[in-house]
Amino acid sequence: MQTVNAAAGRPRTLAENQVWLRQRLEARIHPLDFCDPAGTRAVIDGLTGLDGASWGEAWSAAGARAEAAGDWLNAHAYYFIGRFPTPNHPAKLAAAVKERETYLRVAEEKQWDLQRIVVPFDGRADEGREIAFYYRRPPGIARPPVVALWGGIDAWKEQLTAQVQAFLDAGIATIALDNPGTGESPVVASPDAERQFVPVFDWARAQPDLDGERIGCFGRSFGGYWATKLAHVMPDRIAGAVSWAGGAHHMYQRDWIEASRYPDSYLMDLAEARGRMLGAQNDAEYIERFAALSLLDQGILELPCAPLLLVNGKVDRQCPVEDIHLLLEHGSPKSVRFFPGGHMGHGPHTVPTMVAWLKQQLVGRG
């Protein structure tokens, strides 16, 4: 299969991105893992531009057709691509709203035991006042342990279904929420945005039918950053944390910011999506706010740390594997698993390895 690589220092053209999308569709991997192949090929072939209007409207039209046919899963998948990677245009923002609505219709159709929970958040003047998450329980277990999981820049709580199911199959309840600065998160990503997790952890602890005194944490892609930070700043509340391809320090330095603007593993607008997550209004603000996330510079890496598993592909071009080596040189010992390939090290054993490790921390800790 032909591999598309963006030329150094520039984004892909429309034609190059169409090839990239077809490759992802054929492989059935993110962000096209749930799309109907025939219908998706037609949308890809008919794309006229990568700007927010052209992109959002093309995929939303496909979503509307799927909705009209009662095909909620494909409608959800099309609306997700319509806002991908971030809703930085009105057409993409409209797609993001429909993405959430159709996800709940999918849950209803498939008879998932899914509850959308909203809890208060004591936000600042420019922040939201509540945080929403999806709560699911494994059947037949009276008081299961629980893991909170979140995605990264473009994979939000609605894209965590496969990982949620893996935890449910392992007898673990799940709380799926949005990474700070994405989806329905009430905050932007900032050096103290871990505040958004506290009311969620409090909610889990207060449920009499959950073993929520010390929970598991699972951060996917950029979300692994928060799993790492929470393991260091709230170790008494966390039984174990998994950082699946998250950064720590090197990722936020100027040289990596420039080197990772146009990685071959990412479709488009990675810097724009990161900037929106940070609440940045321009590239200079993006660079400044990204640098402020360094856990090394924040001085927390020598703090006692909850059990922490660091996972990534060996040749990640979005998050430097040097951050894993850095974390091993500071503070408490950590567990590490590298997999072949690039960002996140996708493969048949990746998610099962992480789920088994986290289950051991939750169930075997006594």
Regions from the language model: what does each represent?
Residues 317-323, 346:
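Conserved alpha/beta-hydrolase "acid-adjacent" motif
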Residues 52, 59, 94-140:
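N-terminal cap/lid segment of alpha/beta-hydrolase-fold proteins
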Residues 232-289, 306, 338:
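Hydrolase active-site cap/lid region
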Residues 159, 166, 187-210:
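Alpha/beta-hydrolase active-site loop
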Residues 167-184:
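Conserved alpha/beta-hydrolase
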Residues 303-305, 310-312:
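Short beta-strand/loop motif that positions the catalytic acidic residue
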Residues 143-152:
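Short beta-strand element of the alpha/beta-hydrolase
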Residues 329-345:
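Catalytic histidine neighborhood in serine/cysteine hydrolases
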